[in-house]
Amino acid sequence: MRPTPDLRCYFITGHGSHEHIVDVARRAVAGGARTVQVRSKPITARELYALTEAVALAVGETAHVLVDDRVDIALALRHRGLPVHGVHVGQDDLPVRDVRALLGEEAIIGLTTGTRELVEAANEHAEVLDYIGAGPFRPTPTKDSGRPPLGVEGYRELVELSRLPVVAIGDVTADDAPALADTGVAGLAVVRGLMESADPTGYARRLITGFGEGRQ
């Protein structure tokens, strides 16, 4: 039986030295982040392998650590017994059923979406997925998805349509947490807010508090 991830504060790593990224991950998890996706493009496979290993050793016993796109890296690190819990894949990556077959039933697998059509397509594979990411919430400099921003109201429709928990992504900040939580999303993915914060622990706590307020 695979674990149910806590997606409320979902940290996605950004650009920076490996030391800085690991430090931010550790501090974000101290503030309550319970899912960490290692994604620092552009990066070589070996660099991503080393970074994921470092993040997993730092926080993998407390938070679920996912690898962006690279199923092979997740497989290799899991084979070594490291606390790497799964992957997040995009629309152009391996088919999710093949990812599940490779990683096994206990791995966490997320998929990028952001339109009605993509959510409906994800619903067809709901039994092999754990959640979907949907965005962008607003335009973001960290990733150009080619999809129009959803805004707050765009999430209500996707949450209602989805058979899976939905994570909002795309320049989400802690200030957005109450309004986005009110739409029914399961969590908020944050890159810059945590990477650039002088206090990632406090930032994560503020986001989780705001998320709880939006759910009341």
Swiss-Prot record:
Q: Name the catalysed reactions.
A: 2-[(2R,5Z)-2-carboxy-4-methylthiazol-5(2H)-ylidene]ethyl phosphate + 4-amino-2-methyl-5-(diphosphooxymethyl)pyrimidine + 2 H(+) = thiamine phosphate + CO2 + diphosphate; 2-(2-carboxy-4-methylthiazol-5-yl)ethyl phosphate + 4-amino-2-methyl-5-(diphosphooxymethyl)pyrimidine + 2 H(+) = thiamine phosphate + CO2 + diphosphate; 4-methyl-5-(2-phosphooxyethyl)-thiazole + 4-amino-2-methyl-5-(diphosphooxymethyl)pyrimidine + H(+) = thiamine phosphate + diphosphate
Mention any Pfam family matching this sequence: TMP-TENI
**Keyword Nuclease carried by entry:** no
Which CDD domains has this protein been placed in?
TMP_TenI
Q: Binding positions for 2-[(2R,5Z)-2-carboxy-4-methylthiazol-5(2H)-ylidene]ethyl phosphate?
A: T140, P141, T142
Give the binding site residues for 4-amino-2-methyl-5-(diphosphooxymethyl)pyrimidine.
Q37, V38, R39, S40, K41, D68, T112, K143
Catalytic activity, EC:
2.5.1.3
UniProt cofactor note: Binds 1 Mg(2+) ion per subunit.
GO CC, sorted alphabetically, is:
cytoplasm
GO molecular function list: magnesium ion binding; thiamine-phosphate diphosphorylase activity
Q: Which GO terms describe its biological process?
A: thiamine biosynthetic process; thiamine diphosphate biosynthetic process
UniProt keyword annotations, A-Z? Magnesium, Metal-binding, Thiamine biosynthesis, Transferase
Residues annotated to bind Mg(2+): D69, D93
Q: Which family does it belong to?
A: Belongs to the thiamine-phosphate synthase family.
Other comment: There is also a thiED fusion protein in this bacteria (AC Q8FTH8).
Spell out the protein name for this chain. Answer: Thiamine-phosphate synthase
Q: Which organism is it from?
A: Corynebacterium efficiens (strain DSM 44549 / YS-314 / AJ 12310 / JCM 11189 / NBRC 100395)
User: What are the top taxonomic ranks of the organism?
Assistant: Bacteria, Bacillati, Actinomycetota, Actinomycetes, Mycobacteriales
